[in-house]
Amino acid sequence: MNAEPERKFGVVVVGVGRAGSVRMRDLRNPHPSSAFLNLIGFVSRRELGSIDGVQQISLEDALSSQEVEVAYICSESSSHEDYIRQFLNAGKHVLVEYPMTLSLAAAQELWELAEQKGKVLHEEHVELLMEEFAFLKKEVVGKDLLKGSLLFTAGPLEEERFGFPAFSGISRLTWLVSLFGELSLVSATLEERKEDQYMKMTVCLETEKKSPLSWIEEKGPGLKRNRYLSFHFKSGSLENVPNVGVNKNIFLKDQNIFVQKLLGQFSEKELAAEKKRILHCLGLAEEIQKYCCSRK
């Protein structure tokens, strides 16, 4: 990225929760990728007026403004699909926090729309930019997996806003697919105690070489945000990830990737591989949801 960009893309941030606030901070700070972007305002359902000197603007103004060329969608997952469609139809590039949609068909349709409009549609995956993932990637390369498991625990999450657990937890599924290739669903169960705000989803997957992988999402009051993993290879085992350092500026690293796409610096092959992985994960998440719901 050149230090002095020839032009800046006008950006609006939709949703100013945790992710949206980090995005606004990165856009305002002097980073190489931020030099290509100009934060014009933010959209929120709440009446906030301004945040740190950045003005709130209406959704209608964001869609119709010639100044706005890019939308960062940082709202709850249930609203992503509608926002993406509106901004693509208005001729804007879109960066969206994962999951981009809560169904495979919607994601495919939106990707087709982005291609028709000649716009970038980028789904954030900061989990692939974490130090832990870089460590795992090095550890598993060239090894034959015998079996593996990944358990994620956290506090409760509202399904109405963030989607079925296979969608809200899609970053864990993305880790497994990125490490071991495309996966197929063997079975899935969902245990829920709504009165206790507790849920546990257990998914049995297998690799193309038929090695079993289990993925568990467990959420409830008092559960700390944690990841436990165990991978057994022909050449040894990996039990959990050592402390590999702090994840610095992962949203900024994701923004760098997005700007490279805006500038046409990604090859068609790289873009196609990323799209294939994202759609594979969304398709698996949908399959898991259908499997669990059919057994209720």
Swiss-Prot record:
What EC number(s) does its UniProt record assign? Answer: 1.3.1.24
GO CC list: cytosol; extracellular exosome
Pathway of this protein? Answer: Porphyrin-containing compound metabolism; protoheme degradation
Cofactor binding summary note: Binds 1 zinc ion per subunit.
Catalysed reactions listed for this entry = (4Z,15Z)-bilirubin IXalpha + NAD(+) = biliverdin IXalpha + NADH + H(+); (4Z,15Z)-bilirubin IXalpha + NADP(+) = biliverdin IXalpha + NADPH + H(+)
Localization terms from the record: Cytoplasm, Cytosol
Q: Where does Zn(2+) bind?
A: H280, C281, C292, C293
Q: Which GO terms describe its biological process?
A: heme catabolic process
Question: Which domain of life does this protein belong to?
Answer: Eukaryota
* Residue(s) carrying Phosphothreonine: T174
Concerning PANTHER family, the annotation shows: BILIVERDIN REDUCTASE A
Pathology noted in the entry: Hyperbiliverdinemia: A condition characterized by a green discoloration of the skin, urine, serum, and other bodily fluids. It is due to increased biliverdin resulting from inefficient conversion to bilirubin. Affected individuals appear to have symptoms only in the context of obstructive cholestasis and/or liver failure. In some cases, green jaundice can resolve after resolution of obstructive cholestasis.
Provide the protein name.
Biliverdin reductase A
Organism of origin is: Homo sapiens (Human)
Upper lineage: Eukaryota, Metazoa, Chordata, Craniata, Vertebrata
Q: Which gene encodes it?
A: BLVRA
